[in-house]
Amino acid sequence: MTRRDFLYSSAAASVLAARTRAATAKPAPIPIIDTHTHFYDPTRAQGVPWPPRTDEVLYRTRLPQDFKIHCGDLNVVGTVVVEASEWVGDNQWILDLAKTNPAIVGFVGHLVPGKPEFADNLRRFAADPLFRGLRIRSSDLVRIAEPAVAADLKRVADLDLSIDTLGGAAILEPTLQLSRLLPGLRIVIDHFPFSEWDANPAAMRPALLELGRRPNVFAKISNVVRRVKGALIDDPAHYRPALETLCELFGPDRVVYGGNWPVSDRVAPYATVHRVVADYFASKDRATAEKYFWRNSAAAYRWVRRGAAATVGQ
């Protein structure tokens, strides 16, 4: 073998080895923005309105450092915190907590539309860029026909904030009414698949079909894992039909990930909650999985790039 042949064969071998390494290299893990966590501290002087003392699972301090431990090495780079208190002052409590916790990339607060102080409170909290919207319960959303309620909801839209709706299957029709009233408002429906899904998903399909056609309505898939007669069902295949239906109805651009921690602890460890949906999206292409785990939430909430989430997608 001549020196030229040797150099050529060595170079070819190096190229082949590099290609082999590239082909077999494990792809980088998908970054995750968890769009549904609750943080609170029952030990503070004023206590908390929720959870109750009788809740042995949830009545304990739950803060960002605790969430980080539960996430382990799942590559959760940030979270959108969702209100867990009816107290107006707790909106500021979470915003203050976020100042020293860059893992919080957004906060969905709580104010009751129709109250005289709503507008002033909304402006005050919305001055903080981490305040990304409000969560509205079914008891408030069904009052959408009241002029004061409708006017307050329009204020949310005018500030380019979003609204989460909460209430299971009963919230679908009021959410549809809200979307018709304010078609430019970004709406996130919490906690699919609802508990009612297990009994009769077909009953919800007409409303879901209509909501799925509305471009600013997102489905938060954050209530997947179940227990039946106390036994945990952790086989991802069990949940595939529901996930397939939701992704079919809302499309790949309008489904978002939520872990619902620490409420999820009532059912399963956080790693299990994540694994069930991760298994489903592993069967899709990477672009679709990225949309679910972080890209779509950026469109829905317009969360703030900070901390580990500062360079996501760059």
Question: Each predicted region: which residue ranges?
Answer:
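Active-site metal-binding loops of divalent metal-dependent hydrolases
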Residues: 37, 84, 192, 260-261
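Short, small-residue-enriched loops and turns at beta-alpha junctions
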Residues: 86-87, 113-116, 140-144, 194-197, ...
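Catalytic pocket-lining loop regions of alpha/beta-barrel enzymes
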Residues: 143-256, 305-313
